[in-house]
Amino acid sequence: ISACLVGSEMCIRDSKDTVFAKETGGSLDLTLNLVAMLRLMNPNAMIPATTAVGTIDPRGREKAILSGANVVMPNLSPVSVRKNYMLYDNKLCTGDEAAECRKCLDARIRSIGYEIVTDRGDYREF
């Protein structure tokens, strides 16, 4: 397995434009536990710290990294078009310009003792 994703069950919480609008979303703790289990089961996999966990908890992406995630995906789309693909309500970083988002994300990752690497990030078998 080259990549795994956990977080979508949290995205449905309060997402008024989805069929899941009235469903209860998952918890951050459950998501972090699943990230940790995926890391133990797949030591080389790319596992993202999603914007969904950052939307649910102000330090959610940092917590996901510390739980085993190893990928972050900044929102680099122009601010003017982001409203066209809001997957869930109150999505993190929708108003920040790409450079602002990158600077903020870099500081957040450094605050937990890691740094962002900007190479291609291809899956590698070790």
Language-model segments: residues:
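Single conserved hydrophobic/aromatic residue that forms the stacking wall/gate
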Residues: I1-G7, C11-I12
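Auxiliary Fe-S-binding modules of radical SAM enzymes
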Residues: I12-F126
